Amino acid sequence: MNKALYSTKLGKYYIAKCEDFIKHSKLQGKVQLILTSPPFPLNKKKKYGNFCGEEYKSWFVSLAPLFESLLTDDGSIVIEMGNSWEKGRPIQSLLHLKSLMEFVENKDANLRLCQEFICYNPARLPSPAEWVTVKKIRAIDSFTHIWWMSKNDYPKANNQRILRPYSKSMQKLLSSGKYNAGARPSEHKISEKSFLKENKGSISHNVLELSSINGDDLRLPYSMLSIANTKSNDFYTRTCKKRGFTPHPARMPLELASFFIDFLTDEGDIVFDPFGGSNTTGFCA
C-alpha cells in the first residue's frame, strides 16, 4: 500500500518506485495531466539513478501503458527529455528519439502525439564538453524535447490560458488601427480588419525559451515564450541551504510546469508527476 511522505489539502507526495505506485494506486482513469521530466538517457550513471542505452529505452517504453491507464478520456501526458550522445564519439545518439517514438507507439497503450515543443536554454553550460569546449568541433547542446501526448485527438486544452503579452509593434497597431492589408507573396489575403481584434494577447508558439531576463520584462522579441532562468536564490534553493540539503541537480523550471498546467487542465483536475524530484509540478499545480 502506498503511503504519502507528506500531504496538504491540494496534494500528496510519495516516495516509491513509480511502476509499483501506479499499479497499486486508485488513480486509474482520474488523472487529467501527467507532467514529468524523467531521468534523461545519459551515458553515465548519476546519483539520482538512471539506466543507459537499450536498457533505458526498454524501461521507458514500458511506462507507456501504465501512464495511459491513469488518464481521463481527455487527459494528457507531457514529457520533457534531453538529447543523448554516443559514448566517446562526437555524434548524437538516436536513443532519446527512439525512446519517445516507441513510447507513443507502444501497442499496449492508446497514445498519439498531439504536438512537440522545444525548450531552449541559451544559458546552459557548454555540453558535451569534450566536443564543444575542448576540441571545439560541435555547438552547444542547448534544448530539450517536450512531447505532448494523449489518448484521443482532442484532449482538454485551451490556448487562451497561455497567451503571450502583445509585442510593442502589435500594441501600436491596435492603437492606430492601421496596417498593410491585401495579398501577400505567400498568396494569403489579409483583410482590413484581420489584426484589429483585441484578444488580450497573442497565441503562444511551441518553442519555449529559458533565459536570464529581468523580471520586469514580460517577453523577448519574436515568437518565443521567455522563462526567467534565475534559480540561484529562489525559495527552494534557500530552504535547502538553510536545512543543509543538496538541491536537486535538474529541476524543471516553475514557469514551464505552469505553462502546461494552465494549458491542459482546469482548477480541481488531478495532475501527476511520476518522477517528482523537487516537486516542481506539485508546487505549481
Across the structure, where does each feature detected by a protein language model lie?
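Core catalytic lobe of class I
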Residues: 1-285
